Amino acid sequence: MPKVKKAKKPTRSKLVQKADSIFSTYIRLRDSNNKGIVTCPLCWAKIPRKKAQNMHFITRSCWLYRYDESNCFAGCMRCNVILNWNYIIYTRFMQDKFWIEKVDEMINNSKKIHKLQTFELEDIINLYTEKIKKYARLTT
């Protein structure tokens, strides 16, 4: 009798790639208008959702905030990559959007070491896949 091969579990790096992609898609959907246009929060440029990027206030290397919706906003490539997201303007934007104490807390917590477990990455993938589906239902 032939052996039945078990499905391989995805590697951690594959889960991170998938979570990044799905979360980024959600952020761009969340921050676009009903015509699929995103307004960059730093320079106010209007760009198509598909060309927008997911800008992290606290960098993605900080796992605690990598998938935190309050840390991420859709914006243009110029501000995110070329200008390296202009930290001063982004900080002011964050302080206006939330409050100074919240921004200070995020900055202070960003120094803490936090590693997401495999099941947490799977939960993130499932959560934001569902949120994307809800947006799709609302816009169709």
Predicted regions mapped to residue ranges:
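Short Cys/His-centered divalent metal-binding micro-motifs
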Residues: P48, C72-W99
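Short metal-coordination and nucleic-acid-contact micro-motifs, chiefly zinc-binding Cys/His arrays
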Residues: D20-F23, R30-T39, D68-C72
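Conserved aromatic-histidine-acidic binding/catalytic patches
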Residues: L15, L64, I82
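Short, flexible active-site loops
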Residues: A7-R12, F57-R60, C76
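Short microdomains enriched in Cys/His and/or Lys/Arg
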Residues: R60-C72, Q95-N108
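A boundary/linker detector
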Residues: M1-Y26, D31, K46-I47, M106-T140
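Histidine-centered nuclease catalytic patch
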Residues: T39-N71
